[in-house]
Amino acid sequence: MVDLSKMTKWDMGKLFDFSVLPKQSTEADIRRGCQIAKEYNCKAFCFSSSYWTPIVAEELKGTDILVGAAIGFPFGQQTSAVKAFETEEAVRMGATVLDNCMN
């Protein structure tokens, strides 16, 4: 069990992910989300589209914050083959953790 009374604010950040999930998010929204994740020392920064993976990987380079791409977001209605391709592409572009939306 974790004794929260003995944790610093910096250490506590690792208990949380930070995410920007709206499909209408802009590059500025994603970059700002990365800055917030760094400010609070989050475990991961998650986003709704693999499209943002290279930008997030660039923003988080040199940190231990995980690059969290969503696969099949938001409804998981894609076929397994499409999700497999999306997974491979996200990892190739720099994702270090994946959030797979099941159907």
Question: What positions do the PLM features span?
Answer:
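Alpha/beta enzyme core
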Residues: V2-F45, W52-N103
